[in-house]
């Protein structure tokens, strides 16, 4: 790795500042999903085992910067962490002037977004945060695409900055899939809009042998192939781009299996009746909400040949059971595959949970925006600063 990892650093008797991603759902003062907290435990436990003191920082939600708002407080998260790790977790509401913590102890700082200068990563705030510790550990891949005070600025001014266990695992999995994949490689890019995934599609074209599109993205490609998509969600102004991608794929020998059949409905509703049709038979008052059985078979067959699979986004409105068959078939094809598989993005994780294939996916990324930017080939500021620090 081109940056220091947690295991490269002496942590004994050090105050260790850890940027975690504890942006979790909280209802009535209780954390309702502990997945992101559990993901940070290996890093926290390792620091404690090495004789360090742990100071945790995270954001929660989108409060107005500089204003305290109890609904965005991390106090319930500190309680949830204490239950999971079976140790006391002190909570520091006002922490910028210093944190009282000894080796073997854990302190959870209040929401970093209550601090003026967090989003702009001001030097003043970054230096203040850096002065609280001896070592900075970046372990929040989900925020690595943001140059903020608690993810980027602090790393500039603290003596030692490194990657935590979760961040290291995320990058290793993504680099294995993108930079040194075992071929053939398949990527699934689903979701509602081509516009948000256009650069992802273009960046993946010269890396994959199979590129599967789904959801509203697939509808734009169906339109690009000259078929009517009726009342479906698609982007008219990006049909030309989709046509270009199809032409580029053909020239590169990349297989983009645009759906040949679909499940349509007259209305966007959970109770809408699903009608299976060839794409050429979709009429004006119908909307495409899922791929059809023939398309499912084609995708499943293609995925059998893959040795690496990258998955971002569903292929239909899987939240509605009548239109979940395509994403279910895709999930099962990935689960049954021998390939190294990496999945990421909120909807993708929800699909993995719905269809119970968590243990059959090689690596599930906790990130959304950062995952997409990595797929686009963009540099992530919070990772770049770790690389710079390793050279100094």
UniProtKB/Swiss-Prot annotation:
PANTHER family: PHOSPHOGLYCERATE KINASE, PHOSPHOGLYCERATE KINASE 1, CHLOROPLASTIC-RELATED. Keywords: ATP-binding, Cytoplasm, Glycolysis, Kinase, Nucleotide-binding, Transferase. It is found in: Cytoplasm. SUPFAM superfamilies: Phosphoglycerate kinase. Substrate binds at residues 21-23, 36, 59-62, 113, 146. Its main location: cytoplasm. PROSITE patterns: PGLYCERATE_KINASE (PS00111). The keyword Isomerase does not apply. One of its GO terms (cellular component) is cytosol. ATP binds at residues 197, 319, 345-348. Monomer. GO terms for molecular function: ADP binding; ATP binding; phosphoglycerate kinase activity. This is Phosphoglycerate kinase. InterPro entries: Phosphoglycerate_kinase, Phosphoglycerate_kinase_CS, Phosphoglycerate_kinase_N, Phosphoglycerate_kinase_sf. It is an enzyme of class 2 (transferase). The keyword Zinc-finger does not apply. It catalyses: (2R)-3-phosphoglycerate + ATP = (2R)-3-phospho-glyceroyl phosphate + ADP. Belongs to the phosphoglycerate kinase family. Pathway: Carbohydrate degradation; glycolysis; pyruvate from D-glyceraldehyde 3-phosphate: step 2/5.
């Amino acid at each position: 790795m081109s940056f220091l990892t947690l295991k490269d650093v002496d942590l004994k008797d050090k105050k260790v500042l850890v940027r975690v991603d504890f942006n979790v759902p909280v209802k009535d003062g209780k954390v309702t999903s502990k997945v992101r907290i559990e993901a940070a435990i290996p890093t926290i436990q390792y620091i404690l085992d090495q004789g360090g003191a742990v100071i945790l920082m995270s954001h929660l939600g989108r409060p107005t910067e500089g204003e305290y708002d109890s609904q965005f407080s991390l106090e319930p998260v500190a309680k949830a962490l204490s239950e999971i790790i079976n140790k006391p977790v002190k909570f520091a509401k006002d922490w910028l002037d210093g944190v009282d913590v000894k080796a073997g102890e854990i302190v959870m700082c209040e929401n970093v977004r209550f601090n003026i200068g967090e989003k702009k990563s001001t030097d003043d705030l970054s230096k203040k945060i850096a002065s609280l510790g001896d070592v900075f550990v970046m372990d929040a891949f989900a925020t690595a695409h943001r140059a903020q005070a608690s993810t980027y600025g602090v790393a500039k001014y603290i003596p030692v900055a490194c990657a935590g266990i979760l961040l290291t695992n995320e990058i290793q999995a993504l680099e294995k899939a993108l930079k040194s994949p075992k071929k053939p490689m398949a990527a699934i890019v689903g979701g509602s809009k081509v516009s948000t995934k256009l650069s992802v599609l273009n960046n993946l074209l010269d890396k994959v042998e199979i590129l599967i599109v789904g959801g509203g993205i697939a509808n734009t490609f169906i339109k690009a192939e000259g078929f009517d998509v009726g009342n479906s969600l698609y982007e008219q102004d990006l049909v030309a781009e989709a046509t270009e991608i199809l032409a580029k794929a053909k020239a590169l020998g990349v297989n983009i299996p645009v759906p040949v059949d679909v499940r349509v409905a007259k209305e966007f509703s959970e109770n809408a009746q699903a009608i299976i049709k060839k794409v050429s038979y979709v009429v004006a008052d119908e909307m495409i909400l899922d791929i059809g059985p023939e398309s499912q078979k084609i995708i499943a067959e293609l995925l059998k040949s893959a040795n690496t699979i990258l998955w971002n986004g569903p292929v239909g409105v899987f939240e509605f059971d009548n239109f979940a068959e395509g994403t279910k078939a895709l999930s099962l094809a990935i689960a049954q595959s021998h390939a190294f598989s990496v999945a990421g993005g909120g909807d993708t994780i929800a699909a993995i949970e719905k269809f119970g294939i968590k243990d059959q996916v090689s690596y599930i990324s906790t990130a959304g925006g950062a995952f997409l930017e990595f797929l686009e080939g963009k540099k992530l500021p919070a990772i770049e600063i770790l690389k710079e620090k390793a050279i100094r």
